[in-house]
Amino acid sequence: MLKECIKIEGRAFLGGKVTRVKLGSGECKTLQLSNKYLILPGMVDIHVHFRDWGLSHKETLRGGAAAALAGGVVAVGDMPNTKPHIRTADLYKKRLEEGSALPIIYKVHMGIPQDLEELRAARPPTIKIYPEDVEAFGWGHIEKAAEACASLGCRLVLHCEDPAYFKEGERPPIAELACVERTRQMAFKTGVKIHLTHITLSQTAEAARGWATVDATPHHLLLDVENCKDSGLCHVNPRLRTPEMRKRLLAAFASGLVDIYATDHAPHTLEEKRSGAPPPGICSLDVALSLLLTLWKRGVVTLSDVVRLYSHRPARFFDLQIDVKKGYFTVVRLEEFTVRGEEFAGTCKHTPFEGFKAFGRVFATSVGGRIYFKDGDVYMINI
């Protein structure tokens, strides 16, 4: 972090209104802002993959945190498909302890264990279910986990694709729709809270109303099989859809049917992505806020939508208080720029958004009143 504290003054936008924001004491250095800057609550990304452990060649906790700070993100929810997979209370607690050293707020979704007593020992607020878990354990075990989760007051986060519909490497849209219906029945039977992550279909957003929350990613909102044809960089699960499907999802997103915006930031090495069998995953955490602000600039969403989708609702998801006045904020310069992966702050330096004209470049990020990112530089000297 910067050694001196920072006070922000000046006419700047806060939640769509021109205002003056002061943080810090009179001795603090003052950061003067003009109307060319936007002050927003810090962003919260509930779906990231910070890898590390046996996958540190792809990404590390430190690298992931750097990408978050560069993207205006002050809190994240990390996924459990690490190496080893986080399926035990001991691994869950170990990961949380390691993440506590980061300058951002760090949460972890626990993986589903074979022995459900591990859930009672860990008492995680969220459990992540993958299609591979359905293949490994069966829907019966998933339902037992849902019952245990309901009794503990936690939430199931599902990558909702039914593997029964996977065929010859293809994952058709029907796999998502079938999983949604099966999950709906499970939710009503067990009473468990459900969140469907990285949905790709407007029908999913509509079907989830009343019993589940949903999120959508920047790549499923902006990229499709026609405008993203790089077989490596564009390879992701769930798959990118047709332009028509993408546009319908974007319309659902703009209408308020989608609760949360989340990246599914999933780094792999460029060599892996350029191989004959590229692993699925897209890097976008550094620029996800800018991509969302681009939709605001285009008139697709409002500024209130931006804050609701990427700060307020995901903060509520983790029961966090993310408030500008408490020092959790990001400062955005209102300018257009070209996305360049080589400029990313995290370990991952490649993205299918390469060359994309985005709007709103993150200038500074504060966590708890401390500036950890400013004008292209990340400050993490204490870890």
UniProtKB/Swiss-Prot annotation:
Key word Zinc present: yes
Statement: the UniProt record of this protein carries the keyword Nucleotide-binding: no
Gene encoding the protein: pyrC
GO biological process, one term: 'de novo' UMP biosynthetic process
InterPro entries, per database record: Amidohydro-rel (IPR006680), DHOase (IPR004722), DHOase/Allantoinase_Hydrolase (IPR050138), Dihydroorotase_CS (IPR002195), Metal-dep_hydrolase_composite (IPR011059), Metal_Hydrolase (IPR032466)
Protein name: Dihydroorotase
SUPFAM superfamilies named among the record's database cross-references: Composite domain of metallo-dependent hydrolases, Metallo-dependent hydrolases
Active site residues per record: D264
Species the sequence originates in: Pyrobaculum aerophilum (strain ATCC 51768 / DSM 7523 / JCM 9630 / CIP 104966 / NBRC 100827 / IM2)
Entry keyword set: Hydrolase, Metal-binding, Pyrimidine biosynthesis, Zinc
